[in-house]
């Protein structure tokens, strides 16, 4: 693995680090379409997957399956439209399906429909953000977001579309208008 804080590097440096790491994995046989296929996770995105793909293609130009050496890449690198939000959509669709089965809802000691629930999301990265957006944009109420640097809470609900705009400009969810900051975000998981 590679353990770095991507916030401490500029884009050019991150690209060099990522490609060098990828080349070493490729040379050692740990990364290929048939062996191990990286996907975006914490601290990585479509951008890094594109860099890894570029590194793979430069070392294995004759591999006709080179595009399959990573998943989660951008459409212009051979990725699939909708991939970015797919996991978050899956969370939303799973919740919808769960609430269609009243017997299962009752067994879980929950009442009402999905839109009757007050929901707290853990994480505001790709999965958390897109889960929250699908839930909110379909009538659900998100009352809290727990993130690594703290959380936010509003018992009446948070406008996820406005929060996303805020997060993209501030690089944090903290101090979002009309919410309370929660220092220890894990405490949020017990709020109602």
Mark where each language-model region is.
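Glycine/serine-rich phosphate-binding loop and adjoining beta1-alpha1 elements at the start
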Residues: 1-115
């Amino acid at each position: 693995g590679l353990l770095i804080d991507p916030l401490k590097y500029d884009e050019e440096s991150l690209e060099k680090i990522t490609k060098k790491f990828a080349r070493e994995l490729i040379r050692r046989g740990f990364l290929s379409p048939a062996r191990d296929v990286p996907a975006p996770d914490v601290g990585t995105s479509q951008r890094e997957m594109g860099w890894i793909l570029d590194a793979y293609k430069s070392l294995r130009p004759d591999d006709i399956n080179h595009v399959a050496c990573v998943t989660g890449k951008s459409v212009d690198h051979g990725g699939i439209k909708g991939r970015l939000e797919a996991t978050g959509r899956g969370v939303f669709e799973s919740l919808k399906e769960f609430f269609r089965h009243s017997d299962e809802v009752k067994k879980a000691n929950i009442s009402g429909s999905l839109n009757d629930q007050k929901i707290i999301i853990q994480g505001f990265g790709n999965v958390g953000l897109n889960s929250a957006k699908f839930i909110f944009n379909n009538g659900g109420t998100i009352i809290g977001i727990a993130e690594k640097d703290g959380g936010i809470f509003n018992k009446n609900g948070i406008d996820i579309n406005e929060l996303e705009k805020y997060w993209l400009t501030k690089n944090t969810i903290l101090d979002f208008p009309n919410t309370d900051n929660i220092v220890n975000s894990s405490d949020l998981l017990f709020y109602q």
